Amino acid sequence: MDKYEQLNNLLEINSIIAVKGVAAIFNGNMQIRNPVINVFKENINYSDFVPEYDIPKNLINYFNETINNLEDKYKKIAIAATGAMGYDEKRWNQFITCVAAEKFHGNKRGGLFLHTVGVMKTIENIIVDYIINPFYMSAKDSINKDRLMLKAIVHDIMKIKEYDYEGIIRRKSIKMDHLVMGASYINEINNEVGKVLDEEELDDICYSILSHHGEFGNFEPKTIEDVLLNAADIIDSQIVNAIENKI
């Protein structure tokens, strides 16, 4: 077995290694002579190696306060789905450290949380201008503001299962995307918290998740809440993409 085969057997994708040897320049390239390679597999803090957003405390406070102001049934779904406020530390840690995308926007650890807050704030402005303090006509009979905000909170929640983000950020080789998994997950969460949503409302929320990619997805937005969630998702992702990629 040659050295390359030995290394292939020793190393895996996202392995953290330490290399010790003599650094030298050969033909203009840096080389390490007589390398000794050690692989670390335990007690690894990937935030030391993987790009990560610094999430301000005030955004976490905003997230929690927004959830606490929701109607009780939507509040229960939001807390259980994200693991917020101590409900489930594992879920919360996954949610707050996951990426929003592999390349397009929010492609650092913490990107999913920041994108979620961006969509929430976009929806919040719509709620203020068209329901709470309408500038002309009120949409309170057309839009359930708390349900719409819940949709903003959970619309991308299953990106935690779609992406690898401990090490090289990449989409997993899976057939179902986060939209399909997200709709299924909310159904599971509803069962977990005592079926606080009836079948009609559960179907409505799940369909909004399935259709929030609009023309780029497999499900077409049907209701005004579907359309608004899709629009808010586009607004935040496009703005962040413009900022980060300077387009």
Language model features: what each stretch is:
Residues 1-6, 13, 50-72, 127, ...:
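Histidine-centered, transition-metal-coordinating active-site segments
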Residues 14, 21, 28, 110-111, ...:
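Glycine-centered flexibility sites
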Residues 2-49:
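OB-fold single-stranded nucleic acid-binding module
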Residues 5, 57, 61, 76, ...:
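Generic alpha-helical secondary structure signal
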Residues 131-245:
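Divalent metal-dependent catalytic cores for phosphoryl transfer on phosphate-bearing substrates
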